[in-house]
Amino acid sequence: MHCRMKASRDWIVRALVPAALCATLAARAAETAPPAPVDPPRYTFSWPLDGNTLKPRGGSTRGAPVTLDREPSAAWLALQAPGLAPRERDRRAILAMAGTYRVTFDFLEVATYAATSKPLGPYQSWGTEKVYVDKDEAGFVSLVHILEMRLLDKNGKISEPFVTKHWRQDWRYEPDAIVEYKGADRWERRPLANAERQGAWMQTVYQVDESPRYASIGRWQHSASFSTWLSADTWRPLPRREWSVRDDYQVLLGTNRHTIGPNGWIQEENNLKAVLTAQRDIDTSRPYVAREYGMARYERLRDADFAAADHYYERTRSFWDRVRDTWSAAFEQQGTVTLRGPVDKLGLFTPLFERADQIEAKGVAAGDDDAKLIREALGKMGVYR
């Protein structure tokens, strides 16, 4: 039986969402770790002259052993097929992100621009995750990420699996409009010009409760070595790994690149940490405090057991679809949504997760009463004006 107790769920949501998964890369499972160095460890671009003061942030858990799949995946081979139309090759690149993965996250502050700023230590974490194709329609693909993690205790015993919904990414071809983050917990829907839309795919990223996080437009490029999509400059709200340790800036401004390879995929971020005025504009007197690089590596697994994640996904899928549709309707009707604060920081998504847990435990379909619960939860977040 997998672990869905409230305490376990709350711990994993706090630790893993929205940006990372509460652990160090020392647990890179199924591969032998090198001996501990005698001198303080060094991290690329991480201010090595400061010695041990910039050791990585993150957690300290270790994961159960896994086996990496070193063979080219079927999705990669399908992506390489000759004679595909450009849009179809793009679609296959997006679908190639589905599967089972060991995920490692690295975020590194490489430059500081404020005289009083001190560089943060690198942030490193890990997780095991299954990415599901939730929808595959003409010009639209939706991918849902579910975490299923087994931890090693101090005696080397493997825990029962922890399961939680993580994030969702939607991909739409030549969209009519985009919902953009504007700072201070506000998102606005903006129509797109033909020049922005033509041949482009919009990626929209959603948080654990289906609330918006960020969206951007970009175009896929393909080669025999990899397929890659690069976003335009995008505003993003601060993730937990940042707002939990600092308050000297308000928005991440940067690019997001997805690169598909034979054995998995990589997500790269190049972010400026930007200061906003009370009017949600970049503060020209001190616009940026630092720059960071981010890297998430999704390494495909072989013979991985994600039965608990499958169970959760199948039983709660219709409920989370209702939540997603309610968010979409709010933006269609209002155009702008300003929340009362970060939903993960305030714990405003708790009623939604509690209801999803009930649905999973009882094996019942989402009911009519859920529409009221969802609207009430979104209302408490500040969705409705």
Where are these regions (language model features)?
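Amphipathic/hydrophobic helical signal segments and adjacent flexible N-terminal regions
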Residues: A30-A96, E109-A114, P119-G121, G139-S142, ...
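Hydrophobic/aromatic beta-strand elements that line small-molecule binding cavities or substrate pockets
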Residues: P119-G121, S125-K135, V144, L253-I260, ...
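Extended serine/threonine-enriched, polar tracts that run as long, contiguous segments within proteins
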Residues: L230-T277, Y288
